[in-house]
Regions:
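Mature extracellular/passenger domains of Gram-negative fimbrial/pilin and adhesin proteins
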Residues: 2-8, 20-183
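Bacterial N-terminal signal peptides
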Residues: 9-17
Length: 183
């Protein structure tokens, strides 16, 4: 009986000692969570470029190298993409055109060079097409699109193009920047 009583006293004392430690762990703590960068731009133009169009990735499907068997051959599988404009005011400008820049292929001027690096397909580049469906060389202004008040989508597309005979399989990547011209 004396042992039971002693065990109960020890257990009570231990519980009393542990309980404050448990409550101490529940106190408030502040830790560094990270950094958020905010970027934007104020423009004096007819429209603003939507956030989703400012930095986008256009995923192109696979194409067989046999479709790109001669210099200048395209896959015939254009991939569409748009540059979306918001808050357009046609009292400021009625038309918009786009100019793309990027690393030009060294053997075929006007097209985007394949910059995929390790594992890259060879003898292939990317050809841009304007809103009118015609080829759009780098640094060439696209055909103009007539704006409406509010939101507008400027349609473009891109296709694989052979820059030499003997296209080899591999990855294809390129980066283009664009600027808008309002008139």
């Amino acid at each position: 009986m004396k042992n039971k009583f002693l065990a109960m006293v020890v257990a009570s004392l231990m519980a009393g000692a542990i309980a404050p430690a448990a409550f101490a762990a529940a106190s408030e703590t502040t830790v560094s969570g990270g950094t958020i960068n905010f970027e934007g731009q104020v423009v004096d133009a007819a429209c603003s470029v939507s956030a989703g169009s400012a930095n986008q990735t256009v995923t192109m499907g696979q194409v067989r190298s046999a479709k790109l068997d001669t210099v200048g051959a395209t896959s015939g599988q254009k991939t569409a993409f748009t540059i979306d404009l918001e808050d357009c005011d046609t009292t400021v400008s009625q038309n918009a055109a786009v100019t793309f820049t990027g690393q030009e292929d060294s053997t075929q001027p006007g097209v985007l060079a394949n910059t995929a690096g390790s594992g890259a397909a060879t003898n292939v580049a990317l050809q841009l097409y304007g809103p009118d469906g015609n080829t759009l060389d780098l640094t060439q202004e696209s055909s103009a699109v007539t704006l409406i008040d509010g939101s507008n989508s400027l349609p473009f597309s891109v296709d694989y193009v052979a820059t030499a005979d003997g296209v080899t399989a591999g990855n294809v990547a390129a980066t283009a920047t664009f600027s808008l011209h309002y008139s």
